[in-house]
Each structure stands twice: as C-alpha cells, then as structure tokens.
Amino acid sequence: MSSLRRPEHVVRSIPDALSGARPAISFEFFPPKDDAGEALLWETIRRLEKTQPTFVSVTYGAGGTSRDRTIRVTDRIARETTMTPMAHLTCVGHSVTELRNIIGHYANGAVRNILALRGDPQGGLDQPWVSHPEGLDHAEQLVSLVRQLGPFTVGVAAFPDRHPESPSLDADAEVLVRKADAGAAFAITQFFFTTDAYLRLRDRVVARGRELPIIPGLMPVTNVRQLARMTELSGQPVPKDVSDRLEAVDGDPAAVREVGVQIATELAQSLLAEGAPGIHFITMNRSPATLQVWDNLGLEAAQWGAAAAVPDPVRS
C-alpha cells in the first residue's frame, strides 16, 4: 500500500461530516459510455464542485459492466477535483478474487470510500438473483471484505419503500442492521417520495439498537417518462399526488422540470427538518435541476480547507 500523503479531500471522513451542523450534501454520477457522455459528465462535475459537496459517488453498471469506467472516473475525481470520491462496488458478476483486485486498486490509490452493494440480478430486475460461483451472496459480506483490505469507510444501500425482493419493511431494517454490524458507517437510500417512508426506516433501525446515519437519496424528476422507470427500479408505484402534479403539466417540458424541482425541494426540506443528516442527489449526470434544489434549500458551499478557494456556484 502506498505510504504517500494524500490530499485532505481524499481522506476526509464522511461519517464525521454527517454528524456536523451543516447538512451533508452529496451527488451521484454514473460512468459515461462515450465521449459525448464524458464531456457532459465533466461539465456537470465542474458545476457541482462549486457547491463543495461532502462527497460524490460513481455508480457501478449492472453485472459489473462499467467496472473499468467506474474506476477511471472515481480515480480522476480524486486526482483532478477538490471533491471526496466514493466508488460503488457490487457483488454481482464478480469472484472474490476479482473483488479483492478492485478493492486493492483503490487501497493503493486515492479512494478511501466505497459503497458496498449486492447489485441487481444479471439480466434485469425481473430475474432471480444468482451469485457468482466464487463470489459473495450479500452486501454485508462485501462490507466485511472491504474493511479487511484497506483503511476504507464503507457505505451501504437502504430501502425506505421496501426492497423488491424483501418480504417486509421489518426485514429491510434487519438487513440494514446486519450491514452495520459488518462495519458499514452509513447508508444511502434508494430514491423515494414521502418523508414518512424515510422515518419508518430510521425508526425501525433505531428500535434495533443502531444509530446508523441514513442519507436520503433524492432524484428530481425532470420529465414524465421518468415516472415509469422509477417505478420499475424501486418496485413501488410513484405516489398519486406526485404523478398527478407532474402529469398536469405534461407537454410543457419547462413546467414539468419546475414542478419536479419543487417536489424535490419540498421533500428535501421536510427530511432535513426531521433530522436527516443530509441529501444525496441522484443527478443523472446533469446539474441544472440539482443546483436549483440546492439553491432553493438556501445552502451555502462548505469550506473544506484548500477547497474554500473554489468560486461560488453557478446557479441554474
């Protein structure tokens, strides 16, 4: 493992930031598939960097299909920005040896935060989960492996509206507690639309003796077509009041975007008022809606040492 001193933004503690007075704001990106996507991603990264987020994360494609691109983007964020990167890593499609190699790459580089996930079934969400014959079955096993192999902070996923394969909300809470017992320091939720869903999950975890920080995942809806995809991904229907507000302005893209931003702002305000440690924005590699919600919340850019020299954010 390299003994070189790493920049402050790389080794910054996410759990420490979650316990601070300022809400922890973070952004999620996905690795692009082509040059045009790469250009859009880095335009978005540079715009969002100016808010000085607590951390940013880079997703991992289904079945590990984006492994090399995830590693490349995460490494570049660590090298070329002032932001703290977190790499997503999934069990699906990987042997333990392959997982060790990926984790070892990060341990020898500049990434100190990993979001450990089981991952979606290969072939789609409607397919049964089948583990790699030499791999892992559960996210808590991956949490343990990551913790064994380097000085990592490990986050995990949480599901306020119930995981598609889970029999109950209680079962979801029990799985989350097992992940915490394995060494997870915090959780990020799947996107959802009601504060009550978040509070139910948080209360169930606390009732089981855990004070695990749970960051709400929030995705501003910018077009009505997203609603069907969100239902597919979460396994839960979008609440009728949300779909009604968006469908009422369908056909007017600007109005749909404005309503989507307002819905996201209202939810974020409610969650923060209820004590959520922050908001994790699922950006879809685009900045305008995310920046507008950030602006609506009246947040100020953090002052992280050398990062304080970054100019004020460009509002959109």
Predicted features and spans:
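Conserved N-terminal beta1-alpha1 strand-loop-helix module at the mouth
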Residues: 2-58
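Active-site beta-loop-alpha junctions enriched in small/polar residues
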Residues: 29-32, 59-63, 88-94, 117-120, ...
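Active-site-adjacent beta->alpha loops and helix N-cap segments on the catalytic face
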Residues: 7-8, 14-15, 36-39, 64-76, ...
